[in-house]
Amino acid sequence: MKRYYGFAGVGLALDLPDGEDFSEGRELPVFACEPRAGMTDVTVRIADRLIMPEGKIRAALPNMTEYDCGDAIVRCFGALSDGADNSGIIAEYRESGIRITMKRSVYRKITASAVLETIGTERLVGMAGGAILHSSFIEVGGKAVLF
């Protein structure tokens, strides 16, 4: 199942697994859009277990560890993100797009907020020449105006 969203100059094409429960929340539907050129491809999957990345640690925080795996930057997110066994989400950032794997025992359903937080939306907006200092929106005719 593909879903498309656009905001602040960034377009996201979410490829979600068929048959999995997905929640857009109440905010995301107003950012829905038609597919267009230049969208960032984001593949989201749920797995029973996550595979530990093989690479050099670039950064380590209490809730995220980042690895340089050569052709990808891989981030493990979770309360104890010191490895795949303790992580709830692993995100692989490649030139071709972003692949997010969520651990089934942690996430019963895929939530839009978890996906958007994982992909680093503010970084994508910055790469598109924008900035997010504080975000809020109003709904106008079923669509959102972000400010």
Which stretches of residues belong to each language-model region?
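A noncatalytic interaction/capping subdomain that flanks phosphate/NTP-handling catalytic cores
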Residues: M1-A144
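Hydrophobic anchor at the beta1->P-loop junction of P-loop NTPases
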Residues: F147
